[in-house]
Each structure stands twice: as structure tokens, then as C-alpha cells.
Amino acid sequence: MKRIILASGSPRRRELLSQIGLEFTVITSEADEHTSIKEPARYVEYLSSVKAEAVHDMLQNVLTDKDNDIKLSGEWYNDIMAGSYVIIGADTIVSHKGHILTKPKDTGNAFDILKELAGDCHQVYTGVTLIKNNNVVSNFAEKTDVYCNDISDNEIREYISTGEPMDKAGAYGIQGRFAAFIGKIDGDYNNVVGLPVARVYQELKLWLN
């Protein structure tokens, strides 16, 4: 069995992978996440690949003694040397009428984002990249349509005051208090949380053994 490496510090992605019974290790990087790509699906596909490839490069540097930030046990070292691992990179964004919405810069930006989403349908895209044996073996984007109910300005301010929106794409967490404002979704709920685990699992089955 190959080792699974999650190239993300997101607690929500960790919870989702644990929820389906997978054992994995988290390794994060300081990948450059700037891109001029405007199309939502391509945007997340690209950034998920950047994150996965950055962690892959870190592991290769460990093997050549160029990076001492990651300490590997002997068993881990042998598995990495043998290419016996799969890296999962992921990136999630919200898109409204083609406008990409990432994490809010401040509370004012969070208010503007939530005001834009209120009473309308938007899309959540999560891009996923799998790397095995130095090769990208899977790179895809999953889309979910999310319909928000009307939200008053006071409700938006109260929600922002909880601090919940500030580290989330689109300034909300569907698994948190914002669930009160969701009318319906079309697609994978877990994709909105941060990772389409059902599809990820199916992809992993192709490459883990």
C-alpha cells in the first residue's frame, strides 16, 4: 500500500479524508499561489497542481539532502525513495457569475462577498491533483451549485462577527453557521466543504495498490 500525503493544511480536508477511513500524512509548502487564470475550473486545477508539485519537490530535496525541514523515519525514507506514495493537492474557490471569490482580505471584503452571494446561485469549484512516481496522474475540478437564501445586512454582520468566514473561500463555511442561509445545493456537498472525497477515493483506488 502506498502512503498518502495531503499537501494541504486545511482542517476540513483532513476531517474529510479521516471520515472515509484513510490514513495520511500532512505536508504543506509555501507554494506561489498567484495566477492570471480567470476560468474557475482551470484556476483550481492549476493551483492544486502547484501545491502538490511543491510538496513533491520538497520530498525530492529531502532525498538529496537539500532540505532539512522535513524529517523522515527510515521506513518513510525508503518509501519515498521507492516512489511508494501519492500526493493529494487541492484548492477551492467560489465563483459567482464568472467572478472568482477566494478568501476575504478583511471583514469589509467578507461583507461584500456575502452580499454578492445572498439570494442567488453560485458555484464552488475544488481542483484536485494526484502525483505518483514523479508524475501527475490525475488533475480535475469538481463543481457544485449552491443556492443562497436572502440574507439581511444585519445577518451578514452577525455572521462575520463570529470569525467563521475569514479563512474560507467565498467567506463562508457550509458546514458551520452559514448552513442557515443555504436553500439547496446541486452536486457534492463535501466539494463545498473543501474536497470531493468520493471522487478522490475513486481516483486513489486506481493508484494506491
PLM features: residue spans?
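N-terminal beta1-alpha1 ligand-phosphate binding loop
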Residues: K2-L22, T28
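Short Asp/Glu-rich motifs
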Residues: T35-S36, F178
